[in-house]
Amino acid sequence: MNNPYLFSAILLVIAVVIYISVYISKNLERTYGKEVKTAFEREGAIESEILTQEDMNHLPKPVQKFLIHVGAVGQEKVHSFRVIANGEIKMNRDSNWAKIKIEQNNFTGSELVRLFYLRMKMFGIPIYGLHSYTDKGASMVGKFAGLFTVINAKGNEMRISDTVTLLNDMCLFAPAALIDERISWEQMDDTTVNAIFKTEYCTVTATLFFNEKNELIKFTSEDRYYIDSNGSYQKVKWTTPFSDYKEINGLLLPSYGEAIWNLPDGDYSYCKFKNIESIVYNVGQ
């Protein structure tokens, strides 16, 4: 082989390697897309219904006032919702905040599903994450440059934790979903309630705090598991304050949320959502 052909062959090999690497780097995104498609197919067609006062009669007064305040009454009941948002994440207490963009699809019909896809950069290199919660279980996969797995976690602890997170999402993004019959309630006082979310696989509890404007301002739960540096799971109190209510897709919702681990040696704030680009309800209908 003479030099021109050798050079062309090398360029061809490099091009093929780059193509394969780019294709593989999108595997996690393709997996997310397939899981979302499967969830929509399993959900099937759901008849549109309007949320009325009668649908809320079993709820504690603070929750009823919250749903009225955000404008959920008179709107469609929610069976699924898609969220696109921007924020920041902190991988550990000592790291800097990194910008993230997330897209997630949640389903709250007969089958509970939460599919959360994250994009961020570290040292200028993209990192992709997929958090999957379905009837098959819960898992979290993170890939550096979309090629090298840096996080791969799954198990019952994650399923329990993600059940709490799904309940939190319903409060933050889709308050109309709080009429779900799988949620039972205990009113503690005029501005505080406990929500007990019982699924086919587990039962979790959260406490919701409201202010005098009937806004939900804080969500706490002691049923989420924190993964320490050794990879061990331990239950730790988890708090998500909400604020800056703004109109988003016809509802008055918090535009800022934060996720905080209340660890024994001090709070660890690890995630902030500052810009919710869009929320779309009942996408498959």
What residues fall within each predicted segment?
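Buried hydrophobic residues that stabilize the cores of well-folded domains
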Residues: 63, 67, 101-106, 133-142, ...
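Short, hydrophobic/aromatic-rich segments at coil-to-beta transitions
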Residues: 77-84, 110-117, 187-196, 217-218, ...
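Flexible, processing/modification-adjacent segments and terminal tails
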Residues: 141-199
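Gly/Pro-enriched, hydrophobic low-complexity segments
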Residues: 195-281
